[in-house]
Regions:
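Short, P/G- and charge-enriched loop/turn segments at secondary-structure junctions
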Residues: 51-53, 83-86, 500, 530-535
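Hydrophobic helical h-region of N-terminal Sec-dependent signal peptides
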Residues: 11-18
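C-terminal motif of bacterial Sec signal peptides marking the signal peptidase cleavage site
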Residues: 20-23
Length: 564
């Protein structure tokens, strides 16, 4: 009897061991062999090569992970201003990353320093690039207030180094985000041995600056085609081979998108992302439900802290009342008169600082009075303009040079570079991409269903020969159209639109900004509040922070009953 029991136990153990070995074998072989063909992946003899060791997206400098989900976008409080521009609707955002703080003066000064060193304003071809990147420091001026100290010192003085940058328009914020993308990815490639060490400092110049898309699409043209930089890394073909009889030349000369090394681009957050991250309802989650609705980025209905040590202190930097920007001497409520150093106030439940107060923030979206949730309730965003790489006569991508930099003269007369040497020239998508396509039919979708010809009350089915053009007197949003021209001597001539028939300030060039600021009352601290401002203008109370999309799984952690 005992013998039978022993044999039975041994048999069961043998089966468990065999089953475990089989499953382990299957698990290990799934990465080394193709599930489609059974062929070996990453064979030393050649064939399909793939990064089977990729784990997850690395968190880029300055960012905090924000797990996506569903939420109620829009204002659920009383609309005392009667704007009626943020009706509640249910939206879902994917997981993403967002800057822990607003972009500071020190961060922006690093950008200006790089631009000035690479694109010297003393050279004729580049003289407008640096000037176009500089913030407008005159935004601090007040007709009936003495603010010259901020005008002269706020951006560059070390006392304000960790204060949020202001005077930056939406276009400049976008350009900063692009620059940041290139510098971070350039640093990654250097660390991984794909670029020559320190070349980003010692050998960078206007004609040979790094661009991520150029590196991925035409790597031999990166750094102006200088192979000494691109191929001198540890993994480059020009690198010195290791000694010994088994020394071999490296295979991976260039990193590719499939390498998984390069991160997605830094960008401005969409309005939906910003509002979701600011509200941080995750702090009130219990299992799969939010217990209540937040009025501010913190819990509770008041702007003051209830913690014993700091009881009564304001949780954000905002205007307390008429003529009161921070309380009385010796007992300041929020510790600031104007802006405040970042990380001064507690973060919200996502670990993000100053999502209410300090400065309002640009987001990516073009403004419209409604959020069209009938069309989209997933990653909602208005402002898509689809482009493609420009191809030359030889069928290869065309790289921007010093001779063909495109400049835009903004309605306010400022000149800003649209591209820079080393980048791939872009053109709008055309019929080749849109023919018989259902999800989009044109390059510019900023006014889709709200300002385009089809949504206009003057839309006439019989006038298709005019295409999508709308007559000036039939625009849904009849906003002013200022004009900037150049006379025969090259002087800029600025003309104001003095028509008294204009009915709106809304057009395709006004952008949403979110959150309250040091100049706003508590009403604007609600994450659902939305306002708009021309994308080419700046103020002393609007700053910005960057975001980055998440690739791969929604989250790294498993479900928990409550957020910890």
């Amino acid at each position: 009897m005992k013998v039978n029991k022993i044999m039975t136990v041994k048999l069961l153990l043998a089966l468990v061991i065999v089953f475990g070995a089989t499953s382990c074998s299957k698990k290990s072989s799934s990465k080394s062999a193709s599930s489609a063909t059974g062929w070996k992946i990453n064979d030393k003899k050649g064939g399909f090569q793939f990064n089977s060791k990729y784990k997850k997206q690395a968190t880029s400098p300055g960012l905090v992970f924000v797990e996506g989900g569903t939420f109620t976008m829009g204002k659920v409080q009383d609309d005392v201003m009667h704007d009626w521009n943020n009706t509640p609707n249910q939206q879902h955002v994917q997981s993403f990353y967002m800057d822990e703080t607003e972009v500071t003066n020190k961060m922006y000064m690093e950008y200006l320093d790089w631009v000035k060193n690479v694109f010297s304003p003393d050279e004729e071809n580049y003289k407008n690039i640096y000037v176009g990147a500089c913030p407008d420091t005159l935004v601090w001026r007040n007709r009936l207030g003495y603010t010259e100290t901020m005008t002269n010192n706020y951006l560059r003085h070390p006392a304000y180094a960790d204060y949020p940058v202001v005077g930056v328009n939406w276009i400049q914020a976008v350009e900063f985000s692009k620059w940041r993308t290139q510098r971070v990815n350039e640093n990654i490639l250097e660390k991984e041995g794909y670029l020559k060490k320190d070349a980003k400092i010692t050998e960078v110049k206007a004609e040979s600056s790094f661009d991520t898309e150029t590196y991925l699409n035409a790597p031999s043209k990166t750094f102006g085609g200088d192979e000494k930089i691109v191929l001198r890394g540890r993994k480059g073909s020009l690198a010195k081979p290791k000694g010994g009889k088994d020394a071999k030349q490296p295979k991976n000369v260039y990193a590719q998108r499939s390498s998984g090394l390069l991160n997605p681009e830094y960008r401005l957050p969409t309005e939906a992302e910003w509002e979701y991250a600011a509200a941080a309802d995750v702090g009130q989650r219990e299992y799969n439900i939010y217990k209540g609705q937040k009025k501010y980025p913190w819990s509770g209905s008041y702007t003051r802290s209830s913690k014993r040590q700091v009881k009564g202190d304001q949780l954000a930097n905002f205007k307390q009342g008429k003529g009161d920007y921070g309380g009385i001497a010796g007992w300041s409520d929020d510790g600031a008169d104007i802006t405040q150093v970042v990380k001064y106030y507690p973060p919200n439940d996502f670990g993000l600082y100053d999502m209410a107060g300090n400065v309002a923030e640009w987001v990516e979206d073009v403004y419209r009075p409604i959020v069209d949730d009938e069309v989209s309730d997933f990653n909602y965003f208005r402002g898509n303009v689809y482009t493609k790489n420009k191809l030359g006569d030889d069928g290869k991508v065309e790289i921007v040079t010093a001779e063909n930099i495109k400049y835009d003269t903004l309605p306010n007369g400022r000149i800003i570079a649209r591209n820079a040497p080393g980048q791939i020239a872009q053109v709008p998508v055309d019929e080749k991409e849109t023919y018989l396509r259902q999800n989009f039919s044109t390059s510019d979708n900023r006014n889709y269903r709200d300002g385009d010809k089809q949504s206009s009350r003057n839309f006439d089915l019989g006038s298709s020969d005019e295409g999508d053009k709308i007559k000036d007197n039939q625009r849904m949003y009849d906003s002013p159209k200022h004009n900037v021209t150049t006379d025969s001597l090259g002087n800029m001539v600025r003309k104001y639109d003095k028509s008294n028939k204009r009915t709106s300030l809304v057009n395709d060039d006004v952008r949403v900004y979110k959150g309250g600021s040091w100049k706003d009352r508590a009403y604007w601290l609600d994450p659902a509040q939305r306002r708009y401002f021309p994308q080419d203008m700046a103020t002393d109370f609007i700053g910005f922070r960057c975001a980055m999309s998440r690739v791969g799984p929604k989250a790294d952690k498993k479900k928990t009953p409550r957020t910890k």
